[in-house]
Amino acid sequence: MFLKAVVLTLSLVAVTGAQAEVSANQVATVVWDYFSQLSNNAKEAVEHLQKSELTQQLNALFQDKIGQVNTYTDNLQKKLVSFAMELHERLRKDSEKLKEEIRKELEELRAGLLPHADEVSRKIGDNMHELQQRLGPYAEELRTQVNTHAEHLRNQLTAHAQRMETTLRQNVGNLQASLTPYADELKAKIDQNVEELKGHLTPYADELKVKIDQNVEDLRRSLAPYAQDVQEKLNHQLEGLAFQMKKNAEELKAKISANADELRQKLVPVAEVVRGKLRDNTEELQKSLAELSSHLDRQVEEFRRNMGPYGETFNKALLQQVEELRQKLGPYAGDVEDHLSFLEKDLRDKVNSFFSTLEEKENQDMLVAVPELQLTPVPLES
């Protein structure tokens, strides 16, 4: 299933120009999750992978495109299969090699920082405090924005439901003709308001990435005087830290979007029920409209409750990652399993590069037939 998913993803992007539908990040996640689950060698984990939301999402997309998939040439399919297999095989081979490289890097970095161990620990602690000060307002602002825009969504939809109730009372004789436009508009309003909600909330993740870059750069500068002989190794570790922290920001963004989509999925069926009741008697329709209003209240409140802790949870995760860096660089760190984050970062960089190559090829040669498209696999390590 893994190879089929990756091959079809890359085929879809290469041939149909569907970069907007299937991203490099999605493909990298499929490959990385598969590698991680097989590395754990747990039957339950592999079963979970097969049922994961991402796999279902990609499979659904491919089913929609199955007619196009069947038209791909054997030559292109072979190239893409080769690339997908190479990704996974290189992950497996590079894992142990990179693990040893990171172990040696940390060993040399700790030795270089050892004469200044107390100062280094204090500087990292100061950085954690600064990070906490930077992130605190964002967590509170996210909570405020969630409450504000969720309330706006509820008010918009409740007002629409109330207009339907008023119309119902005034047009008892011709309910279907009077209320059908309102029922159709209700679904459109749900879609519109949920999209606006996502539009207001998801940019926070991008703003947090900027703060992460600022914080990591501040940390690099503060530690530079103590790492003159091992600066390159320190920079590499800080790159890994920034990658992990930004991954948390992406996960926050995905959670916000997923919660908003879940809210939509819970609201739309109720609107459809109301539309279906237009053929019923007035009493049944009044009951449905009353249930609609209470359902709106419950679902919006549940959304607010679910979203409430996200900001604080995100902040704690970032602070914990900086604390883990402090422990890694300390004199008593011992062996640390730290190579996987670097391996994942390298994988995502290479998949992004592969997608960029496809996009450039497509832009430069839009009229070239599909069989003439040449793809060059991008190795995981240069």
Swiss-Prot record:
The keyword Oxidoreductase does not apply. Its main location: secreted. It comes from the Eukaryota. GO terms for molecular function: cholesterol transfer activity; phosphatidylcholine-sterol O-acyltransferase activator activity; phospholipid binding. One of its GO terms (biological process) is cholesterol efflux. Belongs to the apolipoprotein A1/A4/E family. Homodimer. This is Apolipoprotein A-IV.
